[in-house]
A protein has these predicted regions:
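Alpha-helical scaffold domains
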Residues: 1-270
Length: 270
């Protein structure tokens, strides 16, 4: 839809270095049907900021070109096209546009309600949450209520969105018990993943596989949240993990994540 803005920004190394390209694609691990151009986050942020300020010419299905005067109009166009027709980078930029425009909280949440269901990749989800600085400024009770339906979803990245957003916004002393209680209520076996689980490392990038228990990206999201909580509230986090109903594999991922982080590598995880 806006790929004509993006093609010139693809780095030459991604185009010409097969090993580098394979590494980039392996890190993102997009589903096979999601095309990846090869942009990095700084370039996507730059495009989103430019579109937010000045709008863009978008190409709709049927080669129809439409001049959008604002970032909000571009978002509306994203909402109207089949999400599977978008490049990975376009899905990231869509979320960045929701974050960087000047909107009311109600407008953002309306846009976000359309955006979260198209998340199909950890990087799309996490890039959005990491840049949603507006979430830190809204009423916490209001935002917490908004997240609850996503926690209850049966779709992997809708649940991961709720987890990562909670990690970014609610790991505070007065909210910690609420976050832990919500995490402990997750029914991992009821969450559906589009990724296949395999026992060995995928032979090539973008095969739609993960080498762990499904839904891997929800389990890893919980592990990441807990490792972050450990850095801030070590005793309360250990107490929660020891008394929780979390699956053993999630606890193992949490311990591994804690050991890998420079903030918690010397902190007892359990």
């Amino acid at each position: 839809m806006i790929e004509h803005y993006l093609y010139p920004l693809v780095c030459e190394r991604f185009k010409n270095d097969a090993r580098y390209r394979e590494g980039h694609l392996r890190v993102i691990n997009a589903l096979p049907e999601r095309k990846v151009l090869g942009l990095h986050t700084p370039e996507m942020k730059r495009v989103a900021k430019e579109i937010s300020l000045n709008g863009a010419a978008v190409k709709l299905p049927g080669d129809k070109e439409f001049a959008c005067c604002s970032g909000q109009e571009v978002i509306r166009c994203f909402e109207q096209v089949p999400s599977e027709s978008l490049f990975y980078e376009e899905t990231v930029i869509w979320g960045l546009l929701v974050n960087c425009g000047k909107y009311t909280v109600d407008e953002r949440l309306e846009m976000l309600s359309c955006y979260v269901p198209i998340m199909d990749n950890w990087a799309v989800c996490d890039t959005y949450c990491a840049n949603a600085k507006w979430m830190l400024k809204v009423d916490k009770e209001f935002l917490w209520r908004f997240l609850q339906p996503w926690f209850e979803s049966h779709r992997e990245f809708e649940v991961r969105f709720a987890i990562v957003a909670s990690m970014c916004c609610f790991l505070q002393e007065e909210w910690l018990d609420s976050v832990f209680e919500r995490i402990d209520m997750l029914s991992f076996n009821d969450i559906v993943s589009e990724y296949r689980t395999i026992n060995s490392k995928p032979l090539k990038a973008q095969e739609g596989c993960v080498q762990d228990v499904s839904p891997y990206y929800v389990r890893m999201g919980v592990a990441w949240l807990l490792a972050t909580a450990l850095a801030k509230f070590p005793e309360r986090t250990r107490l929660f993990v020891r008394s929780s109903r979390l699956p053993a594999d999630v606890v193992r991922l949490y311990v591994r994540k804690a050991r890998e982080s420079f903030r918690t590598r010397t902190v007892t995880a359990l």
